[in-house]
Swiss-Prot record:
GO terms for cellular component: cytoplasm; mitochondrion. Pfam families: Ank (PF00023), Ank_2 (PF12796), KN_motif (PF12075). Residues 183-234, 282-313 form a coiled coil. This is KN motif and ankyrin repeat domain-containing protein 2. Residues 1-72 are annotated as: Interaction with AIFM1. Residues 488-499, 555-569 have a biased composition (Basic and acidic residues). It comes from Bos taurus. The modification Omega-N-methylarginine is found at residue 105. It is found in: Cytoplasm; Mitochondrion. Residues 676-842 are annotated as: Interaction with NCOA1. The modification Phosphoserine is found at residues 19, 83, 86, 89, 92, 323, 356, 375, 547. The modification Phosphothreonine is found at residues 168, 329, 559. Interacts (non-phosphorylated form) with NCOA1; NCOA2 AND NCOA3. Interacts with AIFM1. Interacts with ARHGDIA; the interaction is direct and may regulate the interaction of ARHGDIA with RHOA, RAC1 and CDC42. Interacts (via ANK repeats 1-5) with KIF21A. Involved in transcription regulation by sequestering in the cytoplasm nuclear receptor coactivators such as NCOA1, NCOA2 and NCOA3. Involved in regulation of caspase-independent apoptosis by sequestering the proapoptotic factor AIFM1 in mitochondria. Pro-apoptotic stimuli can induce its proteasomal degradation allowing the translocation of AIFM1 to the nucleus to induce apoptosis. Involved in the negative control of vitamin D receptor signaling pathway. Involved in actin stress fibers formation through its interaction with ARHGDIA and the regulation of the Rho signaling pathway.
């Protein structure tokens, strides 16, 4: 076997073994052995080993000792083998010393220069321990405990220890040798061979560790490069797609696919409407026709009743007019399902309205002032029946359902010297005056027939913005819920035959109505009134047109509001006069202003109106759609920098005609940032639109956006160009709170205007009694802002205010004078210093007068 050195560990109370002598200088004889992969030498003298095993010298009871600590092991090159009792013969177990075999190749002098491998393999150790236990158990089974003792005749050539206790003699009776069987020996040899094979495998695996480490470092480097490349792609904005983390995307070019032609064939499928679940169109139309016929019959009955009442009234002569009047044609055409009524208005003083309509044909009435003695001659054609009606004397409760109202006007003037239209110059001669005077007596309106709309003596068109028809209809519509809107037809190109044709269309109730209006030479904003409505609307049962007799009763309650709305929508009177050739050519060059409300906007407005009246009338989805539509259309119209004030005004009139609540809601509607139309208009310095919004009377001027600024505060960003702009912001300041603070920094409109150097805005704010001593969150005042930014003129304006206090300090304890000195504005500092000296000189007098002044203020 290998050279074995038994070292006994010293235990307390036990004398330690003698130290082994030093190795002789002469190299000992190396027995026939083999070197293991880890530097161990195994004795291959199997004959002697087998002989020892047969004699039982190697089989003895050895107590399994714990592995010694590293500190108690001898230092030096080599490897410890803690369980070599089965490999080294004649190991004494009676001394109870822990025997360790020090079989390292570096222990010997001839192998000291070679590189050794440190450590031990626990798997080999466990294998050897198991083999030793099995041999001991098998040997101890027949003999009992303590029967296994080494033989004195055993081979001791492998023991090198000196001073060890002598082996126990065989005749001592401590143990009885039991020769092992051949199977045990074969089993031990197999275990040793398997342990060697496992050692070789482990050694090969250890050799692969550096290669794997190199591969790992290469993969880590590739990962780092890919991570950098991915980050660069994200930075450049390339979409990463839906790939997972660590997944690579390889863009491989693909061969272009051949275009595939698909044959298509249209296939028609016959489906019945009732199978699709669609409503029956014919049934719905039949129901509408029945409703219209019923309304028509009712209107005809009321018309006949009105004619009967008119026949009972005494006739009354009409005095001749002394002022220009307007001749209007009222035509009632009877049809199976529809009634068409044409009417227009009179000018000048308040005139009288015809009280009855004939069931067949139409009547022509002349409206004039009460002064005069003769009535103007009137004529009719075979399609028109003319009647001069007296003034109404009694009120009636007639209700007329009107679906379509058209107004036709001709501008003609023969008495005032204006040129007549060519078509009117060739009119046929009128009837005699006597035939005309006989009409009031008969009260039938029968006169000879002539061409339609023929007039013997054209009269001048009156310069009037609103008609009696609008005044009566508007008053009644405000109460009965009638809303109408005018549409202007295109004018002929001939300026001599200037003609204006207006059309009132509709009586409430359409699902998707449409507002449309055009502004041309002779009619613009006056076409709108408070009783505007939608086009092609079906009449609702609860809505009705007020009768003629009801109009005077409705006027006292509704006239003030109607007149105010009409005055806002009027243009100068010159636009209604007959234009000359020069005026017509100049007016044709004007830009046409058109207002068209989409069906979606009208439907959304009607839905919001229902919601404002009843919050449970709409679902959440319907409310969201209506709100979004109105918000987008209103912001597109009124919140742009180039918004047209006339279009804004017309929309406001339309919203007011629908509902006052709707007008308030739309004007103050805000976007996602909390900005209303007033915020945007003030920011864009579009003060004509601001004026229209303020004139609506429902604008919330103190409403703050999410940034905490109100429209009054945003005037600091605007530039005032004209005197009208100054008047507009003065009106804005008077309607709101000029001392309101922003929610972010606590600044007021005066501080913002001072910081931006808006002298005009500062003057307007001071004129509206803005407080100059208000402090923001940092304790700064408007005077400190002016001193910091070096606005000398604004500083002078602020110091001119008697209540300006220059001794106020901010959070840092700085006054306005200190701020000016720190900013290097010496002129402003001198102004403040002079003001301070003046204040100090009048301080005693002010102290003496303080009680009197305080009592006077109280």
């Amino acid at each position: 076997m290998a050279q074995v050195l038994h070292v006994s560990a010293p235990f307390p109370g036990t004398p330690g073994p003698a130290s082994p002598p030093a190795f002789p200088s002469k190299e000992p004889d190396v027995p026939y052995s083999v070197e293991t992969p880890y530097g161990y030498r195994l004795d291959l003298d199997f004959l002697k080993y087998v002989d020892d095993i047969e004699k039982g010298h190697t089989l003895r009871r050895v107590a399994v000792q714990r592995r010694p600590r590293l500190g108690s092991l001898p230092r030096g090159p080599g490897s410890w083998w803690t369980s070599t009792e089965s490999l080294c013969s004649n190991a004494s177990g009676d001394s109870r010393h822990s025997a360790y075999s020090y079989c390292g190749r570096g222990f010997y002098p001839q192998y000291g220069a070679l590189e050794t491998r440190g450590g031990f393999n626990p798997r080999v150790e466990r294998t050897l321990l198991d083999a030793r236990r099995r041999l001991e158990d098998q040997a101890a089974a027949p003999a009992g405990l303590g029967s296994l003792t080494p033989s004195a005749a055993g081979s001791t050539s492998s023991l090198v220890g000196v001073g060890l206790p002598p082996p126990t003699p065989r005749g001592s009776g401590l143990s009885t040798p039991v020769p092992p069987s051949a199977g045990h020996l074969a089993h031990v040899r197999e275990q040793m061979a398997g342990a060697l094979r496992k050692l070789r495998q482990l050694e090969e695996q250890v050799k692969l560790i550096p290669v794997l480490q190199v591969k790992l470092s290469v993969l880590q480097e590739e990962k780092r490069q890919l991570t950098v490349q991915l980050k660069s792609q994200k930075f450049l904005g390339h979409p990463a797609g839906a790939r997972g983390r660590g997944e690579l995307c390889l863009d491989l070019p693909e061969a272009p696919e051949d275009p595939v032609t698909l044959e298509t064939r249209s296939v028609g499928t016959w489906v019945r409407e009732r199978d699709l679940g669609m409503p029956d169109g014919e049934a719905a139309l039949a129901a509408k026709v029945a409703v219209l016929e019923t309304q028509l019959k009712k209107a005809l009955q009321e018309l006949q009743a009105a004619q009967a009442r008119q026949a009972d009234l005494p006739p009354q002569a009409w005095p001749p007019p002394d002022s220009p009047v307007r001749v209007d044609t009222v035509r009632v055409v009877q049809g199976p399902r529809e009634v068409e009524v044409a009417a227009s208005t009179a000018a000048g003083a308040p005139a009288q309205r015809a009280q009855s309509l004939e069931p067949y044909g139409a009547g022509l009435r002349a409206l004039a002032t009460s002064n005069g003695a003769e009535s103007p001659p009137v004529f009719r054609s075979h399609e028109v029946m003319e009647t001069v009606f007296p003034a109404p004397t009694a009120s009636t409760s007639n209700v007329h359902q009107v679906k379509k109202i058209s107004i036709t006007e001709r501008s003609c003037d023969g008495a005032a010297g204006h040129p007549q239209a060519p078509a009117e110059s060739s009119l046929s001669p009128p009837e005699s005056e006597g035939a005309t005077q006989a009409q009031p007596e008969k009260n039938t309106g029968q006169v000879p027939a002539h061409d339609d709309t023929t007039i013997k003596e054209p009269i001048r068109q009156a310069a009037c913005h609103e008609s009696e028809f609008e005044e009566a209809g508007g008053a009644g519509g405000a109460q009965a819920g009638l809303r109408s809107i005018m549409k202007q037809k295109e004018e002929p190109t001939d300026p001599e035959a200037h003609r204006r044709s207006l059309q009132f269309v509709g009586v409430n109730g359409s699902i998707s109505p449409r507002y449309e209006s055009s502004s041309e030479d002779s009619s613009t904003a006056e076409n709108f009134s408070d009783n505007e409505s939608t086009e092609n609307e079906a009449p609702e049962p609860e809505e009705r047109v007020p009768s003629v007799a009801e109009a005077p009763q409705l006027r006292p309650k509704e006239t003030a509001k109607a007149k105010t709305s009409r005055e806002e929508s009027q243009l100068p009177q010159e636009s209604l006069h007959t234009p000359t050739a020069e005026g017509a050519s100049g007016s044709s060059a004007k830009d046409e202003i058109r207002m068209e409300l989409s069906p979606d906007l009208i439907s959304a407005c009607l839905a919001l109106e229902k919601y404002l009246e009843n919050p449970k009338a709409l679902t959440e989805r319907e409310l969201k759609v209506a709100y979004t539509t109105v918000l987008q259309e209103w912001l597109r119209l009124a919140c742009r920098s180039d918004a047209h004030p006339e279009l804004v005004r017309r929309h406001l009139v339309t919203f007011r005609a629908m509902s006052a609540r709707l007008l308030d809601y739309v004007v103050n509607i805000a976007d996602s940032n909390g900005n209303t139309a007033l915020h945007y208009s003030v920011s864009h310095a579009n003060f004509p639109v601001v004026q229209q919004l303020l004139d609506s009377g429902v604008c919330q001027v103190d409403k703050q956006n999410r940034a905490g600024y109100s429209p009054i505060m945003l005037t600091a960003l605007a530039t005032l160009k004209t005197q009208d702009d100054i008047q507009t912001i003065l009106q804005l300041f008077r309607l709101g709170d000029v001392n309101a603070k922003a929610s972010q920094a606590g600044q007021t409109a005066l501080m913002l205007a001072v910081s931006h150097g808006r002298v005009d805005v500062v003057k307007a704010l001071l004129a509206c009694e803005a407080d100059v001593n208000v402090q923001d969150d940092d304790g700064s005042t408007a005077l400190m802002c002016a001193c910091e930014h070096g606005h000398k003129e604004i500083t002078a304006l602020l110091l001119a205010v008697p209540s300006c206090d220059i001794s106020i300090t901010d959070r840092d304890g700085s006054t306005a004078l200190m701020v000016a000195l720190d900013a290097g504005h010496s002129e402003i500092a001198s102004m403040l210093y002079s003001r301070m000296n003046i204040k100090c000189s009048f301080a005693p007098m002010s102290d003496d007068e303080s009680p009197a002044s305080s009592s006077a203020e109280e």
